[in-house]
Amino acid sequence: MFNRLCFQCLIGGLCVSPFKERARKDFDYDFELYEKDRAMIVIQNPKIEEYRDRARLTANIDVDGTTRAVWFEVDPAYGEFLCFERSDAFVVGLLNWAMRNGHDIVCEAPVTEELLYQITEFLIPSLSKSSNALKAIKIEATTAPSLSNARAVGTGISCGIDSFHVLAKHIDNNYNSFKLTHLVHNNVGAFDVYKEKSYEVREALIKRAQKVADAVGLKLIVSDSNLASAFPQNHSYTHSFSSCF
């Protein structure tokens, strides 16, 4: 969800977006043209709202006649970077669930053209051919160009060997477009494995991540989301999707 700062792909996140210059506009979709007999997920227009002391990006998701609200939130300082103009984050976050349950996806807001092309032409065909559990679904959406952004570069910091490797490789290199500006701690499903201890475990990991951020002189962005509870999945198999949310 954090493609809005706009984090270079070291972090993945699609919820964070471009900088300023955003046309606040609703995008209409002609649902009458869609096959009515197919099971589908409808991603309504995302919106930004204040929730307690956080900035929250929310989209109502219609599934088989019921509606679930999916949200992603950050500190208000980063609220302007949340991306309401595209359905990108929600498409990626729900793609695995949709393929496993045989639901096509319909988006009210546009999807970035390059992303929709890669998912439709390469990712879905490859996944559906490699696993009988994943259906070759359709995504119906208008396309739009990539949004301008603040050119930030971030990566997740779990304090595991992989995240430290990325940190070491990109904290100071010769490529400005890939030089880290932020570290990120997301909550998109991994902490459910700790059940009743999940809150305590997450708070301890945030403190540890903050120590690392302070030590290397980078800002830490802490996000939260209900994606895992709104659409329960096995995080071990789906983290590649949810981590890009």
Regions found by a protein language model. Name each.
Residues 9-10:
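Intrinsic disorder
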Residues 21-22:
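Glycine-biased, low-complexity coil/linker segments
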Residues 37-152, 166-226:
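RNA-binding accessory domains that recognize and position tRNA/RNA substrates
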Residues 155-161:
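Short, glycine-rich nucleotide/cofactor-binding loops
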Residues 219-245:
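Conserved adenosine/adenylate-binding substructure
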